[in-house]
């Protein structure tokens, strides 16, 4: 339970709470600047997340389709400095779990995508088809992180955006950070400490975020105290 899934799941549920009615459609979008330093496991997980088949929620059913048949030319505007960014759709575990959350029980459609600064979009089809190429690129990125971080043109920026909609309203939840490491570590630590302190009632077992009864406003205040500031736009 770190950045995705974890913090992104919280942002989906927090946006849904502001909507105040059942969510029918949802989107998760993440922007990674090329200067953001990430761990080896995080890099591998990111590249392995967009294999040749794409998992998404469509008409309330989990489907697997070829990425070329699903909005291959779609773009997204994160903010005024990051507009019309081409997207790489990926299979988040939240596709399988989000409907467990009470406000998402009637969810019809949900997909997840990210933009990685400076990644040539022309190489994406090859990455999807070849495990060897994915592993090769992962090794290259991991080895060159120091150089990428020093390059002033590479942004040290992570932007997380969740959208939820119903027939009448749209709510956007937005977060800016300079470190995916920090987002992952802080969210995980906050959840564990909240459980230890008794703020989150939980039985022994294995649970996803959607399974846990959490006061979302309380959790948001704790995150604010850790300088993780999430904004809401309605």
Predicted regions and their residues:
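C-terminal catalytic/substrate-binding lobe primarily of soluble NAD(P)-dependent oxidoreductases
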Residues: 14-234
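Short alpha-helices
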Residues: 1-16
